[in-house]
Amino acid sequence: MERVVITGMGAVTPIGNDVPTFWQSLKDGKCGIGPITRFDVSDYKVKLAAEVKDFDISQYVEGREAKRMDKSSHFAIAAAQQAVDQAGLTPGTFNPYRTGVIYGSGIGGLYITETEVEKLINKGPGRVSPFAIPELIPNIVAAHLSMRFGFKGENYCPVSACATANHAIGEAMRAIRHGYQD
């Protein structure tokens, strides 16, 4: 069996949008929870959340392409780009058919679901983006990552509620350990 190691990491979190910032925030005991800023919470009992702050997708994806994607894809692309860079993966350094994406998500694109349902209700079905359905399905993120990096191996998205991250890591480890992927 193959030995499995993590060679690159990326992070987009409420306490840092890259691994060094995230790690320093963890060491400093920084809390990522704060008042909800994305919508009016006056009618809700819950007023706090752990929102990602100061994230700029334009560092990773061009404007028009970014507009077609859900925020979940934005965050995943940023974290994956950081991990790919840290691992030193460049075209020609890996076999694309033995390199894949197993992306874990507990739920699909909520932001695009919210905005497109709002359009449907207020402006009618003709105003709903043709990208709405693909972008709200969780496995679209794995597809974006595979296309972006040229990975043509396994590509899927386990969805197993709160265990999803560990599920995806375990699946990736097994794919490498048993020789299906590099």
Residue map of PLM features:
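Short loop-beta-helix segment that forms the pyridoxal 5′-phosphate
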Residues: E154-S160
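Internal active-site segments that recognize and position negatively charged phosphoryl groups
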Residues: E171
